Amino acid sequence: MSRLSIYALMLAAGLGATLTGPASAQTGQVALGEPVSVETLAMAIAFERAKERGVDLKVTSFSKEELAVQAVISGQAQIGIATPYAVMQKSKGTVKNLVTLTKLVFFPIVEKATYKTWKDLDGQPFTFHSRGSGTEAIGNIMAKRQNITFGQRNYISGSDNRIVALMNGQIKATILDLPNTKILMEKAGDRFATLPGVENPASDEILFARTDWIDKNKDKVDILVEEFVKLWGEMAKNPAIIETERVKRGLLKDLPKEIVEKTTAFYTTGVKEGLYKVGGGDAAKSDFEFYLEAGQLTGAPAELKVEDFWYLAPYDKAVKKLGS
């Protein structure tokens, strides 16, 4: 196992011990769409802040994004963070998006010795984060634009884990987030290259919840969304707030110094490049165009109603209270 993978497991163990506990009937079950890592540390902190304001939560991390979405759809969880568009139309209002947390600032990566253009990938295997994820949406769009068809589709959750697979020669084409793309290129830029991707990125990770839970817990929903909007605003001004909050709350106490030192750099890069960016109604409209082209939504943009997919009142309240 690589050092990066070992540290990822340590992160997961540290957050799991802090964020989980006995669940009561009033506890909001939260399903995270990927294993806990540095990338989700800000989300963990926002949940902790909401808990301090009386929102009882228990967070569970799933190995695959589609499992987290299904947990919310089925009622095993009430709240989720993932990309739920692929199943939202079929679920007919079971869940509603609350706030966009991250954007699809991702890059297609290929092994230079094997592929040089998108055309070279016609009929070839390609690895994504998970079924129905933003990475697969990007792949679908680029395949459509390039008039190619992928061969076998493989799925490895987490950009850091896909880096390990690339370095070990297990995969030769995938899509990585911005920070991990930079890490890969620093380590092995002579072996790998980026291909053209999509511009004007849509929402990636979205905070969403069951509609029936929203209706019964509107005060809690307001607090939850407000804490995410507030923290993202603080992060935009000072990315080091994530490390400050980690220390303040005693999260990840056993985290190696090497990783702690990289946390602020990770969020600094993410904020600078627009990865961590909240959104509501403005995000919804661009999301429709993107996920329609990706095949994860059906119909025409003009036919899709924002209110069928989003409950915007908490986000609008938070922005009015805190400022954009």
Q: Where are the model-predicted features located?
A:
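Positively charged n-region of N-terminal signal peptides that target proteins for export
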Residues: 1-5
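Bacterial N-terminal signal peptides
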Residues: 7-18
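Sec/Tat signal peptide C-region and signal peptidase I cleavage site
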Residues: 18-25
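Short, glycine-/small- and polar/acidic-enriched structural segments
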Residues: 26-156, 163-165, 172-178, 191-192, ...
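Pocket-lining segment of extracytoplasmic ligand-binding domains
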Residues: 84-85, 158-252
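Small-molecule pocket liners
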Residues: 102-108, 203-207, 211-212, 287
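Secondary-structure end/capping motifs
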Residues: 217-300
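Conserved C-terminal helix/tail region of periplasmic/extracytoplasmic solute-binding proteins
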Residues: 288-324
